[in-house]
Amino acid sequence: MHNVIIESNLDNLLNNEYDGYQAFIYCRKGSCILTYNEGRHEMNGDSCAIILNKKFLKDIAPAPDLECEVIYIEESFLRQSEPRNPYIIQGMLALYSYPVIKLDKEGTKLCNALFQNFKLRIENTQHKFYDDILRTSIH
C-alpha cells in the first residue's frame, strides 16, 4: 500500500488493510455518526474529523447523502513529517475525546483548499522531491 491514500467515501474506514493509517475526513454534505472512543460523534456538512487510531473506531453510520473526502496517511510517514511540538500530546488527547470539528465559513474554505492542494500534490508522482512535498503538505 501507499503512504497516502485519498478516497471519496468511508467504505474503507473500518477496513483492516488500513490499520496503521490515520484518517482525515472532510464532510462536504450530508452527515455521518462515528462511534469512537466510547462516544457518538456526528459529522455534518462542513465539518471534519481526525481519526488518530482506528482501533477506537467501533462503527460508522453514514447518511445516504454523505459526500466526503478521506485522506489516509500511514502513521510512520506522518511521524517523519510532523514538527516536533511539545504541545502535540494535548492536541492528540483532545482529538481522542472530540474527533469531529465543526468548521465556520473560513475554516470550511481553508479545509477545502487544503484537501484540494493535497490531491494535486499527490498526483505529481514524478516530481523530483515528491516525498518532501507530501510531507510538507501534511502540515
Please place each PLM-identified region on the residue numbering.
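N-terminal regulatory/effector-sensing and dimerization cores
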Residues: H2-A94, H127, D131
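Amphipathic alpha-helical segments enriched in hydrophobic/aromatic residues interleaved with Lys/Arg
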Residues: L93-I138
